[in-house]
UniProtKB/Swiss-Prot annotation:
Organism field: Aliivibrio salmonicida (strain LFI1238) (Vibrio salmonicida (strain LFI1238))
Purpose: Involved in the gluconeogenesis. Catalyzes the conversion of oxaloacetate (OAA) to phosphoenolpyruvate (PEP) through direct phosphoryl transfer between the nucleoside triphosphate and OAA.
Coiled coil: none
Gene: pckA
Required co-factors: Mn(2+)
Protein name: Phosphoenolpyruvate carboxykinase (ATP)
Pfam families: PEPCK_ATP (PF01293)
EC number(s) recorded for this UniProt protein: 4.1.1.49
Length: 541
């Protein structure tokens, strides 16, 4: 440890977090220290990292290769009982637990971490100093500390001197809960939050994304209550300062499409929109690597080097990586500090107001067009619907594309009612004069997925404005206006009906999908605003 690292660790007393007899604290260690720690030859099982030929370390997360939403819990108390969007009020994973159950779970984690040599990473969630969360993550596993160092915003030495956490994450991945059945819980594993104590605890799952997404869920609670949009989206900015945000569930293309050599990346997954504009929550990227190639995604491929951390990829004996192998999971990932992408907004990941808002969907039915411009009413409708296909591997038990509706393109991370996010977003869009588009990165009548080249051509046309200067035609049932041609895009795919040998096939699939949209949206029709939006969705005669 350097003198500064000794100084940082010496100042830290973890007894305030319920931990006792801690043998050593490594606080915000350097990447070199983490590299030595996570590749130690004496490490076993999921603690052990292996070296790859690209210079990055690779780890396995065991059976937990994605988030475990069925094991997510939030304490129901005076703070949350009337504000939180609970699982008995809609389609979400915010299952309530009592303070007593919380105390039992927390005791399991503090017992697991006490008496150990611990890593502590202090960082920020949110690039705006006025609204950011100061987050402290405590773990006994070196690579989990590495993941957090990659993903959260790294404080300066001066900021560390006065660092006081707003939220504490205690990751006791080795701890499991033997009493889960008596407590009415799903399994021995748990990811639990207490908004009064401002603490997250993790037990049983080794998946790194639980720490990142846990803090996203907390930002999703705190920011909209202040009138700030909290969004599951990527964002980038052009040479003229024009900002675009890309909403979408995991695997729909947020990271890939926002990582564009012609534009500077603000961030790839989680953002806020306040009076100054768009700002990133994170200090890193968490990109899918399944079937990654240097030719198709050079920026992401080149980011996989020393200090990047690979998850669940297949590493051959010679250290080479088989990115095409999805035998462990389709949800293979890499985390890296955002500066591994050359073309980023510096020094702070923030920019002005967005003028293009893009909803990415992966339509497993082959019904929706590759692109359509949305009216303000359609924007609200499709934001609340959040239609996509769950893609293989981002959650346990999902291996084939499955159609789903996820409010705000991120229902798994929402902690307030979806209409609150829609209201704040639309207010921000109206104030900025932003336009919205829906872009389908999924399948069509050919049975194949729309090519990344065609999708990039569509995004280019949206961002440079050329999509606004072409002829359009109306797609029935969904009442969407689609272009008849776009530069650099295969014209034959723009009307999805043209991709079927028999157009009647599209008609029957469109009716099926429309009925699903209508059934899902019924949950929002218990007030006048929701009823008024029904006209903006699909219509069946």
């Amino acid at each position: 440890m350097t003198v500064m690292e000794h100084k940082k660790a010496a100042q830290l007393d973890l007894s305030q977090h319920g931990l006792s007899n801690v043998t050593e604290v490594l606080r915000n260690p350097s990447y070199d220290v983490l590299f030595e720690e996570e590749t130690r030859p004496d490490l076993e099982g999921y603690e052990r990292g292996v070296m790859t030929e690209l210079g990055s370390v690779a780890v396995d997360t065991g059976i937990f290769t994605g988030r475990s939403p069925k094991d997510k819990y939030i304490v129901k108390d005076e703070t949350t009982k009337d504000t939180l969007w609970w699982s008995d009020q809609g389609k979400n994973d915010n299952k309530a637990i009592t303070p007593a159950v919380w105390d039992d779970l927390k005791a399991l984690v503090t017992e697991q971490l006490s008496g150990k040599r611990l890593f502590v990473i202090d960082g920020f969630c949110g690039a705006n100093p006025d609204t950011r969360l100061s987050v402290r993550v405590i773990t006994e596993v070196a690579w989990q500390a590495h993941f957090v160092k990659n993903m959260f915003i790294r404080p300066t030495d001066e900021e560390l001197e006065s660092f006081e956490p707003d939220f504490v994450v205690m990751n006791g991945a080795k701890a499991t809960n033997p009493n889960y059945e008596a407590q009415g819980l799903n399994s021995e594993n748990f990811v639990a939050f207490n908004l009064t104590e401002r603490v997250q605890i993790i037990g049983g799952t080794w998946y790194g994304g639980e720490m990142k997404k846990g803090m996203f869920a907390m930002m999703n609670y705190l920011l909209p209550l202040k009138g700030i949009a909290s969004m599951h989206c990527s964002a980038n900015v052009g040479k003229e300062g024009d900002v675009a945000v890309f909403f979408g569930l995991s695997g729909t293309g947020k990271t890939t499409l926002s990582t564009d050599p012609k534009r500077q990346l603000i961030g790839d997954d989680e953002h806020g929109w306040d009076d100054d504009g768009i700002f990133n929550f994170e200090g890193g990227c968490y990109a899918k690597t399944i079937r990654l190639s240097k030719e198709a995604e050079p920026d992401i491929f080149n980011a996989i080097r020393r200090d990047a951390l690979l998850e669940n990829v297949t590493v051959r004996n010679d250290g080479s990586i088989d990115f095409d192998d999805g035998s462990k999971t389709e949800n293979t990932r890499v985390s890296y500090p955002i500066y591994h992408i050359d073309n980023i907004v510096k020094p702070i990941s923030k920019a002005g107001h967005a003028n293009k808002v893009i909803f990415l969907t992966a339509d497993a039915f082959g019904v929706l067009p590759p692109v359509a411009k949305l009216t303000p009413e359609q924007t609200k409708y499709h934001f609340l619907s959040g239609f996509t296909a769950k893609l293989a591997g981002t959650e346990r038990g999902i291996t084939e594309p499955t159609p789903t509706f996820s409010a705000a393109f991120g229902a798994a991370f929402l902690t307030l009612h979806p209409t609150q996010y829609a209201e704040v977003l639309v207010k921000r869009m109206e104030a900025a004069g932003a336009e919205a588009y829906i872009v389908n990165t999924g399948w069509n009548g050919t049975g194949k997925r729309i090519s990344i080249q065609d999708t990039r051509g569509i995004i280019d046309a949206i961002l440079d404005g050329s999509i606004d200067n072409v002829e359009t035609k109306n797609i029935p049932v969904f009442n969407l206006e689609v272009p008849t041609s776009l530069p650099g895009v295969d014209t034959s795919i723009l009307d999805p009906r043209d991709t079927y040998t028999d157009p009647l096939q599209w008609d029957s699939k469109a009716e099926d999908l429309a009925q699903r949209f209508i059934k899902n949206f019924a949950q929002y029709t218990d007030n006048d605003e929701g009823k008024a939006l029904v006209k903006a969705g699909p219509q069946l005669d």
